[in-house]
């Protein structure tokens, strides 16, 4: 299983997680020239940008630890572009992280959803 496949499994799990909790997924893999946002969703008057980090082991630490300050700032800039381009208005904009650990077979062993992560 390559990194792209691992990432897709994590994103698929996260979309299912969000949908089952009443979120409406608006976009997946929203790209601009300098990066992307994995998932953009809404729930009521809240617009949520979700960074999904998926790993098969903890050799490099917990998945959430790889969302650096630089990565957070890049996501915020992409979010600004998204809101401006779509001309959206929400009472709240939130940045969440989904951290997932997979088994060697690609099954979700552990996950943690962090609302308002940054």
UniProtKB/Swiss-Prot annotation:
SUPFAM superfamilies noted in UniProt: Restriction endonuclease-like
InterPro entries (UniProt xref): Restrct_endonuc-II-like, tRNA_endonuc-like_dom_sf, UPF0102_YraN-like
CDD domains xrefs: PoNe_Nuclease
Species per Swiss-Prot/TrEMBL record: Dictyoglomus turgidum (strain DSM 6724 / Z-1310)
NCBIfam families linked: PRK12497.1-3, PRK12497.3-3, YraN family protein
The protein's name: UPF0102 protein Dtur_1530
Any one GO molecular-function label of the UniProt entry: nucleic acid binding
Record-stated family: Belongs to the UPF0102 family.
């Amino acid at each position: 299983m390559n990194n792209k496949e691992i990432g897709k499994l994590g994103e698929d799990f996260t979309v299912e997680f969000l949908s089952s909790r009443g979120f409406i997924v608006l976009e997946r893999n929203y790209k601009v020239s300098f990066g992307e946002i994995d998932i953009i969703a809404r729930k009521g008057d809240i617009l949520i940008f979700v960074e999904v980090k998926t790993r098969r082991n903890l050799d490099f630490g917990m998945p959430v630890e790889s969302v650096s300050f630089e990565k957070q700032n890049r996501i915020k800039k992409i979010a600004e572009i998204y809101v401006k381009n779509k001309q959206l208005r929400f009472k709240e904009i939130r940045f969440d992280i989904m951290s997932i650990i997979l088994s060697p077979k690609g099954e979700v062993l552990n996950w943690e959803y962090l609302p308002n992560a940054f």
